[in-house]
Structures are given as structure tokens and as C-alpha cells.
């Protein structure tokens, strides 16, 4: 089982658009619960994740549509692909294959930072520009800068 401490909230994930940051905190908490729970609780957590992801992605997709966010198609397609995988894995977990569910949870933990740093950060900047006319100002606590390769 993956170490649940590997995927916890960090200010590194803050993007500067409050509603998105709040939803991302919830995403991290639910995935972390999936990584660390016993098998008897896993189905409930993955179903909670599916409900969260449906609402999370619908909210972001709505922002992109309502504001005519230029690169929205790729972003929306990625959301749809994640949801499709989640629904497929839920069916496998219902048959008792918790290992497949845990692989999905680990994959979500691996996927989220890249998605947030690339696709969601662009959307966050867009949303702040639409509402306030400029880029978000983000104050992060205890974050060590990543080295660029």
C-alpha cells in the first residue's frame, strides 16, 4: 500500500483562485484517505472521490465554458478521462479488487501535481484576470523551490 504521507496538502498546490484552491484541498484529502484506509473502508472512499471529482470537474468545466477559456478542450478531455477511469475502477473494487483501487489512488496522487501546475494554474490565472484584471498573488508557507531540469 502506498504511504499516505506521500500525498498531503502543501501550499505548493495553491494557485491563487480561492474556489479552486478549496476544491483542490478536498481532492488531496480524499485521495489521501483512499491511500491510507483499510480495505473495508475503501469502496466508500472511492465512491466519495467519484462524487467529489464529478462536482470538481463540472465546476472547472463550467468556469472554462462561461468565460471562453481558450485552451479548454484539452482540460475538459483530461477531466473526462479521469472520471472514466474512476468509474471503471469502482466496478472492479465492487468485485473485491482493492489492489486495482489502490493503484488508481496512487495514480491520482501522481497525476494531480502536474495537472494542477500546468492546466489548473493557467485556468486560475485566467479566472483571476477575468474577475480582478490581473494575475493571482499567492503566498506559500514552508515551500522549497523545485529545481528545474
Model regions and ranges:
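Small-residue-biased structural context
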Residues: 1-149
Amino acid at each position: 500500500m502506498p504511504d499516505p504521507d506521500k500525498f498531503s496538502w502543501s501550499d505548493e498546490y495553491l494557485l491563487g483562485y480561492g474556489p479552486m484552491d478549496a476544491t483542490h484541498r478536498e481532492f488531496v484529502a480524499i485521495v489521501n484517505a483512499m491511500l491510507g484506509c483499510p480495505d473495508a473502508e475503501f469502496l466508500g472512499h472511492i465512491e466519495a472521490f467519484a462524487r467529489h471529482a464529478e462536482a470538481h470537474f463540472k465546476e472547472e468545466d463550467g468556469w472554462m465554458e462561461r468565460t471562453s477559456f481558450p485552451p479548454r478542450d484539452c482540460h475538459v478531455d483530461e477531466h473526462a478521462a479521469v472520471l472514466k477511469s474512476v468509474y471503471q475502477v469502482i466496478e472492479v473494487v465492487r468485485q473485491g479488487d482493492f489492489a486495482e483501487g489502490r493503484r488508481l489512488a496512487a495514480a491520482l496522487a501522481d497525476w494531480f501535481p502536474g495537472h494542477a501546475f500546468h492546466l489548473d494554474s493557467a485556468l486560475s490565472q485566467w479566472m483571476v484576470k477575468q474577475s480582478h484584471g490581473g494575475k493571482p498573488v499567492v503566498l506559500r508557507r514552508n515551500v522549497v523551490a523545485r529545481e528545474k531540469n
